[in-house]
C-alpha cells in the first residue's frame, strides 16, 4: 500500500492532515539513508495504539527489521516514546523500545503537527541495539568477575610488598655489617 492509501485508512485525518503527513513521508528515505537507521511514520488511532503508515529502511547499512512493517500496529507497552510524543507534542529522544519483531531498539520520536497544532503523527528513528546490549552484559559479567578476584589480587599484591620490604631490610643490614667490618 502507498502512504496515501494508508492515510485514507485513518478516519481521524482530514485532507489537510494527510497532505502534511505526505510531505513528511516524502523525506523519509533520505532520513533513513542519512542516519543509517529505520524511519517510520505512525498515526495515532486511539486505545494506546498507532498505525505504522510508512517505513523507510536504509539502502546501504543495516536495518532492525526483517520485513516492512507498514500496516502493523504499535503499542504503548512496546514503544513508550511514540506515545509520549503523541501525548506531549514534543520530541522524545534516546528511549529503549521493542520492535514488532521483538528486537531491542533505541528510538527518537518527533511529533508531526497539523496546521492547527494537533499531533497527527510521529516520525520515528529506530536504531538496533542488540549488539550494544550484548556488550553491556559482557561488561557487567567482567566487572563482577573482577570484583570477585580483586580482593585476592590486592592481598597478593600486599604480601608481595611486604616480602620486598623484608628483602630491602636484609640487604640494608648486610651492607651495614660490611661497612662496620
Where do the protein language model's features map onto the residues?
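Conserved small/polar residues in nucleotide/adenosyl-binding loops
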Residues: 180
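Structured interaction and signal-relay segments at domain junctions
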Residues: 28-92, 100
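A short beta-strand signature within small-molecule sensing/ligand-binding domains used
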Residues: 92, 102-111
Amino acid at each position: 500500500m502507498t502512504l496515501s492509501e494508508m492515510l485514507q485508512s485513518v478516519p481521524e485525518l482530514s485532507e489537510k492532515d494527510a497532505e502534511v503527513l505526505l510531505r513528511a513521508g516524502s523525506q523519509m528515505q533520505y532520513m533513513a539513508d542519512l542516519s543509517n537507521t529505520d524511519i517510520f511514520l505512525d498515526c495515532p488511532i486511539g486505545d494506546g495504539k498507532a498505525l505504522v503508515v510508512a517505513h523507510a529502511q536504509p539502502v546501504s547499512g543495516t536495518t532492525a527489521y526483517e520485513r516492512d512493517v507498514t500496516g502493523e500496529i504499535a503499542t504503548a507497552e512496546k514503544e513508550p516514546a511514540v506515545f509520549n510524543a503523541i501525548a506531549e507534542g514534543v520530541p522524545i529522544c534516546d528511549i529503549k523500545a521493542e520492535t514488532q519483531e521483538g528486537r531491542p531498539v533505541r528510538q527518537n520520536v518527533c511529533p508531526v503537527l497539523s496546521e492547527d497544532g494537533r499531533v497527527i503523527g510521529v516520525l520515528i528513528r529506530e536504531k538496533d541495539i542488540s549488539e550494544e546490549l550484548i556488550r553491556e552484559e559482557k561488561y557487567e559479567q567482567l566487572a563482577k568477575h573482577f570484583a570477585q578476584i580483586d580482593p585476592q589480587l590486592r592481598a597478593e599484591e600486599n604480601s608481595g610488598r611486604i616480602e620486598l620490604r623484608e628483602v630491602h631490610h636484609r640487604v640494608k643490614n648486610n651492607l651495614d655489617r660490611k661497612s662496620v667490618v
